[in-house]
Amino acid sequence: MASLWLLSCFSLVGAAFGCGVPAIHPVLSGLSRIVNGEDAVPGSWPWQVSLQDKTGFHFCGGSLISEDWVVTAAHCGVRTSDVVVAGEFDQGSDEENIQVLKIAKVFKNPKFSILTVNNDITLLKLATPARFSQTVSAVCLPSADDDFPAGTLCATTGWGKTKYNANKTPDKLQQAALPLLSNAECKKSWGRRITDVMICAGASGVSSCMGDSGGPLVCQKDGAWTLVGIVSWGSDTCSTSSPGVYARVTKLIPWVQKILAAN
């Protein structure tokens, strides 16, 4: 195996900040030059969170799905000693009104395999709820039968490396627009590693990279941004001609709903 970089909206979200509709609109310059991404508009991806260890090191992304819950990748290995940082754009700034949220419980999908990277999803129950605002709100979850066809133009965001050999990750949240691929097309690059609980995007001059893991791949549905993928793995050089691989959220929704209902 190549050295892989392991990279229904709830009514409780409240009418003021409905899911998937940022108060500050994102501006995506189509298939822009996160490798070959661009700075996001500050606050325009309000569900994007940074997962940080106790030293403040950003190691993965995640997405708010309600005031109490964050979804990320299982391979991120989140612990309750880590924190969720919401409302952040520039990790080099002390001026932002960020929320540093403790994690009460980590629910890793029991079917996750580090060998196949199947079922790469973890849910984080926050110890104290996020306070929704202009820059902090939830992404919509798809239903299990939602269809997001190949060719759909979607967006991914994160503080991951902008070059695979970069010494550090960018301070400012990066974004890129990229098309979904069919699994058949994706298998041309990745072969049998691609399973039905994965979805591919990119190979279009942009790529997710190390540090983006756990973050969102979102597509618009009925005018609201919906979580279609969770950044999972891809080329060890973050090649922009190889598709990035994401956990396919529609296939994982039954497990998500079960955990949310029981907790």
From Swiss-Prot:
Q: Name one GO biological process term.
A: proteolysis
Which residues, renumbered to this chain, carry the PTM Phosphoserine? 93
Statement: the UniProt record of this protein carries the keyword Hydrolase: yes
Q: Where is the signal peptide?
A: 1-18
Q: What pairs make up the disulfide bonds?
A: 19-140, 60-76, 154-219, 186-200, 209-238
Q: What residue stretches are annotated with the Peptidase S1 domain?
A: 34-261
Enzyme Commission number, as recorded: 3.4.21.1
The reaction(s) catalysed by this protein are:
Preferential cleavage: Tyr-|-Xaa, Trp-|-Xaa, Phe-|-Xaa, Leu-|-Xaa
Annotated keywords: Digestion, Disulfide bond, Hydrolase, Phosphoprotein, Protease, Secreted, Serine protease, Signal, Zymogen
Q: Name one GO molecular function term.
A: serine-type endopeptidase activity
> What is the enzyme's class at the highest EC level?
hydrolase
For this protein, the record's PROSITE patterns field holds: TRYPSIN_DOM (PS50240), TRYPSIN_HIS (PS00134), TRYPSIN_SER (PS00135)
> What Pfam families does this protein map onto?
Trypsin (PF00089)
Q: Where is the active site?
A: 75, 120, 213
Gene Ontology terms: cellular component: extracellular region
Family as reported in the entry's similarity comment: Belongs to the peptidase S1 family.
Name of the protein: Chymotrypsinogen B
Q: What is the lineage of its organism?
A: Eukaryota, Metazoa, Chordata, Craniata, Vertebrata
Q: State the gene name recorded for this protein.
A: CTRB1
